[in-house]
Amino acid sequence: SDQGSSAGVLSGNAQDAGDWAALPNAYLSWALNKDLYVGVGMGAPFGLVTEYNRDWIGSAHSIKFDIKTININPSIAWRVNEKVSLGFGLNWQRMEAEYVRRAGIVDLPAGAGGVLIPRPLSQSFATLDADDDSWGWNVGALFTVSDATKLGVSYRSKIKHELEGSLSVTGPNPVFNTVGSSGANATVELPDTFIFSVAHQLDPKWELLGDISWTGWSSVDKVDIMRSSGALAQTLDTDFQDTWRVALGANYQLNDAWKLKFGVAFDETPVKNPEKRLT
């Protein structure tokens, strides 16, 4: 608890920090001829939203984390022959981040005899708002092994975001609000991914699907939040590890108008242990 702060005791259950979110996805493609196709896709490959009450016990670590990405992916695909097709794409990606926590600022009220006594200002809050646009690429190949079986491989590159924005402090002390606020920046390298997939047409009704993917989350080792002066404001020690994901599924052609899809997946977490978990 925070007995000596101007806000009194910090306590309480964090409650449910998650909520519903909309994930935009759209895809279009055009055939230039029988062997050459172009297309464009839009999606949100990475995102996070957690928000707690401002008086919860972990508010000095995090009150709100809101990370959004939008990815636009123009691509081209070429059918080399009846057995092999190749694809290549560019990725324009926008990232927006908001991070709010209780500020680690110390007030210095005069105690007995005029002595300055440090005291946390738990009524003060620090907010980081930052964004960036960046580019990446992806490649893929599709192999027709037989009339019933197809294999696919794809790779999507890392995308390095150099986020720029502001770090603002709000609270009861206008001096600390002014001194604590500044421009800010942070660098985040979102991970690359490799996917191997297989599809097998079991019969006219059933199609079996499977894939295994690897994501290089170790690229997000830590995130340094820097002030525009060059001073370090905070380090987020993410220390993520690379992960694997395995998925199995099936499509069932109910009739000419309807296809039913089923699937299950096991996805590893990039967080090494509970002590490394970000709120």
Placement of each model-derived feature along the sequence:
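Outer-membrane beta-barrel porins/channels
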Residues: 3-13, 20-279
